A protein has these predicted regions:
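Short, basic/polar N-terminal leader/transit segment immediately after the initiator methionine
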Residues: 1-3, 20-21
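N-terminal secretory/targeting leader peptides
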Residues: 18-110, 116-299
Length: 299
């Protein structure tokens, strides 16, 4: 009888010390970033010995993409994932992975990540945030409702922008930028608010972009932008050292898995676009040279 009481007391103490983190995710549950985050959350929860539970909230259900960074920083959400280059105003380094044609392969993207990571982590720490991991999207391509054969075809094209780099690209190519979050892409194309964008084959597939009159995907391999997962430092400091170490280990595994998933999506999602009836291919050499010159101008 005394043993039963003792076990109950120990269990109640453990439960009292247990932490619950709500993880804000901007993208739908079927997106590989969200699926990877869900697996990370599950693994952390299982390996914490009851000390930490992470509950994921995909599809902007807890906070929308543009709200997640601030929500985690202020502690409204303990953990969240955010598209890094949308945060250029917070720290210009967060936008380095969206510098056009600076990194046009996964190898170069990893080199760029390794070169910038330490300073990014330091900058986030100063803002009360702990960096866990980052995963790239597949190579960014150009989507369009109409065929693009020359620089003139870009003039006045209503273009979806999501950070300062894409706004600048629009300005340098004569396109008309409109700021649209990923969750609003389908609506923006269906209403005619935009008619072109630069984003990954994954985003196009997940939003079924072909249902909104988008017929062309041009694989220009413009850049490999990343999502990062961050934790509120106050929430982090409530964990004991062993739990923190375990979370970091799982974060490293999630990062490795995420890069693999991204590489798979780079091939498979372009095939999905083609299977849905879209024209998938490259732009002509003169147009590719024009885009690369834009990248040099922005460097």
């Amino acid at each position: 009888y005394l043993l039963t009481i003792l076990v109950s007391i120990i269990l109640s103490i453990n439960l009292a010390n247990a932490e619950k983190w709500d993880m804000a995710l901007a993208y739908g549950a079927g997106n590989f970033h969200s699926a990877n985050a869900a697996e990370f959350a599950k693994n952390v929860t299982e390996k914490s010995g009851g000390k930490l539970t992470i509950v994921t909230h995909p599809g902007g259900s807890l906070f929308k993409g543009g709200e997640i960074f601030r929500a985690v920083r202020t502690g409204q959400a303990q953990i969240g994932e955010r598209f890094m280059s949308a945060l250029g105003k917070e720290d210009p380094l967060l936008e380095v992975d969206s510098q056009p044609f600076l990194a046009t392969s996964y190898t170069d993207a990893m080199k760029l990540y390794k070169a910038s990571k330490a300073e990014i982590v330091k900058g986030l720490d100063a803002k009360g945030l702990v960096f866990l991991y980052a995963v790239p999207w597949p190579a960014q391509g150009l989507y369009s409702k109409k065929e693009i054969n020359s620089v003139n075809d870009l003039k006045g094209l209503k273009f979806r922008a999501y950070n300062s780099a894409t706004i600048r690209i629009a300005e340098l190519t004569g396109m008309a930028p409109t700021k649209i979050e990923a969750a609003e892409i389908s609506q923006a194309f269906s209403t005619g608010a935009v008619e072109s964008m630069i984003t990954s084959p994954t985003t196009g597939k997940n939003s079924k972009i072909w249902e909104n009159g988008v017929k062309y995907f041009y694989d220009i391999a413009a850049w490999f932008p990343k999502n990062m997962v961050i934790v509120n430092k106050d929430a982090w400091n409530k964990l004991d050292k062993a739990t923190q170490d375990m979370v970091m280990k799982q974060a490293a595994l999630a990062e490795r898995k995420g890069w693999q998933l991204s590489k798979q999506g780079n091939v498979g999602d372009k095939k999905a676009l083609a299977d849905a009836g879209m024209v998938v291919g490259k732009v002509n050499s003169s147009l590719q040279a024009h885009f690369e010159k834009v990248g040099e101008t922005m460097a």
